[in-house]
Each structure stands twice: as structure tokens, then as C-alpha cells.
Amino acid sequence: MKKLVAALIAVTLMAAPAAAQSKSALTGAELGAVLSAAGLQAEVTEDAQTRAPVAAAQAGAITFWVRALDCAGTPKACSTLMFFANFDLGREAAPADYQKVNAFNDRQVFGRAYLLPKRNEIGVDYVMELDGGVSADHISKNIARWTDVIDAFIGHFSSDEAGS
């Protein structure tokens, strides 16, 4: 019985540091820090209407944004992060662009492509949920996944395969 109690205490003590490192929301300062830790240049500001954090960031030559959603408290801490990047088509959107968007979305598990026809832009986004608590490693891996989504998106839309 003493061994069982000792084992339960040890498990509880080992779990405590992991729970302390769990994050269920990020402030603007924390968002900037995790993006910087991932090797990305980022500038965090606030949304003019909601005062929620918004980051403008660079992944190589690609500019993207991270909009923080589902925020509470002061400073605002947000449990949902939406990463997105938009690209100029250089022309009006065509039916083949919609086919390419659909093909990307059919094949890609992470990330979602979309068209902004009134702006002649095409884009991709990726949502990261923190609600319920996630580790710093989980956040880091999701940021790396986002850069992979950008690469897959650019590769897909740079291919010569019309409608695929």
C-alpha cells in the first residue's frame, strides 16, 4: 500500500509541471514571443475594433497575419489563432481558380484555401485552437505546420495543372 501511495504521489508531482506549462490562451506579448521563438519576424498590434492581438509576420519572403479570436481579460488573452496569407492574382479570378481552390481543400488536411474575387486575391488560412490547454510544444508544432501549409499552398497554385 505504501508503494501505491508513493507511486500516486510521484505521478501527481510529475504531472504538475506539465499542467503549469499548458496554455489555453495567449496574450499579444505571448503571441509575439511564440512566433519569434519559431524563427519568424513578427510585429503584434491590436485590432482597432476588438482590441484583440493581431500579428503581421514573415516566413521567408511571405507576409502573413495571425488574428487572435475568442479573447477575454486584460490584457486580452485569446484561445483561437487564425493564421492567414493572401496573394494577389494579378488578374480577375477565373473558374479554374475555384477548381484549384477546391482541389487544394480536398487534398490538404491542414489549411483552407479561398478566393477573394472582389480583391483579385487568393489565400490560405489555418486555425489553431488553444481552448482546454495545450503545451508549448504543441503551439510550436502548429506554427511549423502553418509554414508547411503555406509551402503546400504555393506549390499547389504554382503548378501548371489547371483545376488540380
Predicted regions and their residues:
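Charge-rich, low-complexity N-terminal segments
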Residues: 3-4, 16-63
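Long, continuous compositionally biased terminal/linker segments
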Residues: 57-87
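A short, solvent-exposed beta-edge/loop patch
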Residues: 108-150, 154
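A mature extracytoplasmic/lumenal domain signature
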Residues: 46-48, 68-70, 85-87, 126-130
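Hydrophobic core
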Residues: 9-17
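Extracytoplasmic/secreted envelope proteins and their assembly/folding machinery
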Residues: 28-35, 95-101, 140-143, 147
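Short, highly charged C-terminal tails/helix-capping segments
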Residues: 158-164
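Short, internal acidic amphipathic alpha-helical interface segments
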Residues: 22, 36-38, 79-121
